C-alpha cells in the first residue's frame, strides 16, 4: 500500500495592511496607534499635511518620534503621504520631509498629482512631469527614500497604469515607484492583470478602495457617476486583482484609504481629505478583515 502523500501547499505570503490616516487628523500619534490596532491594521500610512499630528512644519522630528512609538506597539509605517499639491522637488518642505523619513525608517513618500486641463499639451506635460520625478529621485537617492506616484482617476496624469508608465518608464525604480490604486483602476483603468503587469518593474505599494458607477436620477447627464464604497460593495474584482498581485510575487503593503459614499463631485476633487465618510471606523475595520480574507483566498 502506498503511503499517503500530503499535497504541497504554497506558503502564504505575508503582507502589511495599513490604515491611511487622512480621516483621523484629530488623533495624536499615540491615539493613531491605538486606533490602527483596534481596527485590525498592521500600521499606518501617515498623512503629512497641515493640521495633522505629523505635518510639514514638524516632520523632521515628529515623524521619527512617531514611528519609534509605533514600532514599540508592533506597528509599521511603510509610507508618508504628502499634500496633493506637492509636485516640486525644490519646494522648501521637501528636504525636511525626506530627512524625517530617512531618520524614521519610512521607505517611501507619496507626492502630489500632475493636473491635466482640457486643451493642455499632454505629451508636453508628461515630459515636464518626468523631469520633476527625476528631481524627486535625486532627493530620494540622497536620503535613501523612494518617491511614489499614485494612480488616480480623473483629470490628472497617471489616471491608470498605462498613464502612470508614461511618467515612470525609464526612471530608476529604486527611487521612483508605482503606486497603483485598485479602486481608481476600476473607474478609469485596465484589466487588473494587464495594468499591474505594466507597472510590475516599478511596483512599490498598493492603494485599496472600492468603487462603482452609480445610477443617477432619470434625465441626469451622465446617467452613471463614480461612487466609492466599502470593500466588497463595488465593482473591484478582488480575487482577480489580488490574484494578479500574487502572480507577480507581490509581498509589500496595502494602504486602505477608507473612502465611503463619496460621489462624483468629491471623487474628482483630487485629495478631498476634509470630508469625513460615514461609518468610518466600522467600515474601516470591516475593510481590514475583508482584505485579509481576500488575500488568503485569492
What do the PLM-derived regions correspond to, one by one?
Residues 1-2, 7:
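N-terminal export leaders
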Residues 3, 30-33, 69-73, 86-178, ...:
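Active-site acidic/histidine proton-transfer and metal-coordination neighborhood
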Residues 8-21, 25-40, 105, 161-176, ...:
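Histidine-acidic metal/acid-base catalytic patches
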Residues 18-21, 79-81, 148-150, 179-181:
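Short catalytic-loop micro-motif centered on adjacent basic/acidic residues
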Residues 23-25, 48-50, 83-86, 113-117, ...:
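Active-site-proximal loop/turn and secondary-structure-junction residues that shape catalytic pockets
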Residues 42-43, 76, 107, 146, ...:
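Residue-level detector of anion-binding/catalytic polar loops
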Residues 45, 79, 110, 148, ...:
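Conserved beta-strand positions in the central sheet of alpha/beta enzyme cores
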Amino acid at each position: 500500500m502506498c503511503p499517503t502523500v500530503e499535497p504541497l501547499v504554497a506558503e502564504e505570503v505575508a503582507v502589511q495592511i495599513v490604515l491611511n490616516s487622512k480621516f483621523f487628523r484629530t488623533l495624536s500619534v499615540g491615539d493613531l496607534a491605538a486606533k490602527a490596532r483596534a481596527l485590525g491594521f498592521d500600521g499606518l500610512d501617515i498623512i503629512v499635511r497641515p493640521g495633522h499630528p505629523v505635518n510639514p512644519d514638524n516632520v523632521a522630528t515628529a515623524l521619527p518620534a512617531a514611528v519609534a512609538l509605533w514600532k514599540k506597539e508592533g506597528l509599521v509605517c511603510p509610507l508618508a503621504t504628502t499634500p496633493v499639491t506637492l509636485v516640486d522637488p525644490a519646494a522648501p518642505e521637501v528636504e525636511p520631509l525626506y530627512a524625517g523619513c530617512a531618520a524614521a525608517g519610512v521607505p517611501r513618500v507619496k507626492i502630489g498629482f500632475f493636473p491635466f486641463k482640457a486643451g493642455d499639451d499632454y505629451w508636453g506635460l508628461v515630459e515636464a512631469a518626468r523631469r520633476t520625478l527625476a528631481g524627486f529621485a535625486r532627493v530620494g537617492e540622497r536620503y535613501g527614500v523612494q518617491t511614489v506616484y499614485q494612480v488616480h482617476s480623473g483629470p490628472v496624469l497617471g489616471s491608470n497604469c498605462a498613464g502612470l508608465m508614461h511618467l515612470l518608464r525609464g526612471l530608476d525604480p529604486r527611487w521612483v515607484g508605482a503606486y497603483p490604486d485598485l479602486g481608481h483602476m476600476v473607474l478609469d483603468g485596465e484589466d487588473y492583470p494587464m495594468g499591474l503587469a505594466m507597472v510590475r518593474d516599478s511596483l512599490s505599494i498598493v492603494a485599496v478602495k472600492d468603487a462603482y458607477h452609480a445610477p443617477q436620477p432619470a434625465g441626469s447627464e451622465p446617467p452613471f457617476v463614480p461612487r466609492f464604497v466599502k470593500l466588497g460593495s463595488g465593482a473591484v474584482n478582488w480575487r482577480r486583482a489580488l490574484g494578479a498581485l500574487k502572480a507577480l510575487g507581490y509581498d509589500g503593503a496595502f494602504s486602505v484609504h477608507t473612502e465611503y459614499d463619496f460621489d462624483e463631485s468629491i471623487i474628482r476633487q483630487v485629495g478631498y481629505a476634509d470630508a469625513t465618510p460615514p461609518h468610518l471606523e466600522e467600515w474601516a475595520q470591516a475593510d481590514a478583515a475583508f482584505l485579509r480574507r481576500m488575500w488568503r483566498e485569492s
